[in-house]
């Protein structure tokens, strides 16, 4: 059985304490230039982890990922250029 996971973006003041983020979930990516980290955790624990992370002194802000709520199946529409029947002939 798979557990539902959701990501969150943690904006940091400094990267020195980035190792401390491991206890909140799987650290997927850390950007050294823009000073943020992407962390994945269980959906059930997301609100609790966000509250704890935002109270830490080295964290600027915490944003949840909206990917689980976005529809990823796209409807197939015909291309307008293919829709027209161009009769090339004399």
UniProtKB/Swiss-Prot annotation:
Family: Belongs to the UPF0298 family.
The protein, known as: UPF0298 protein BPUM_1393
UniProt GO cellular component terms: cytoplasm
Location (main, coarse): cytoplasm
One Pfam family matching this protein: DUF2129
Source organism of the structure: Bacillus pumilus (strain SAFR-032)
Keyword line: Cytoplasm
Top-rank taxon: Bacteria
Entry's localization field: Cytoplasm
């Amino acid at each position: 059985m798979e557990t539902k996971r959701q990501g969150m973006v943690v904006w940091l003041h400094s990267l020195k304490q980035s190792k401390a983020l491991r206890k909140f979930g799987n650290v997927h990516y850390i950007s050294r230039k823009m000073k943020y980290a992407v962390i994945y955790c269980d959906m059930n624990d997301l609100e609790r982890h966000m509250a704890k992370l935002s109270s830490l002194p080295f964290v600027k802000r915490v944003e949840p990922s909206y990917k689980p709520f976005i529809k990823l199946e796209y409807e197939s529409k015909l291309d307008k250029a293919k829709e027209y029947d161009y009769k090339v002939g004399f």
